């Protein structure tokens, strides 16, 4: 398993000449998409990858919803191009999807099929480690991002916002 110091060094290397541009670097916008659809056939998976202030592939996983619970749940899986780091989280939305917040697995209705372990296994098979949520806010000196005032490990590996 990677340590945050390893990922911080890799981020510093990747950002040494400025923010990496996935389009210019030829990053694959479809990386893992078809394989994820096969790994999680019960869920709808949408590719949200773009390289506007993002340094990862981002996939939204929409499980079958539970009628009558008053919330809509979606998962997000991100695979960094900066290093082999993987992130997974759930968002709970109001039914109109205008308001949402990240929630732990424990707050999911038990009827929702949680693909977390399947995605962790998939990521490990591809050589990726899941980043500990406590590491996402680790500040990195010497990196200037385009949007964020402070460079953090999460912003350098996944999204600069």
PLM segments and residue spans:
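Extended, charge-biased low-complexity segments
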Residues: 2-126
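Acidic, proline/glycine-rich low-complexity IDRs
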Residues: 119-161
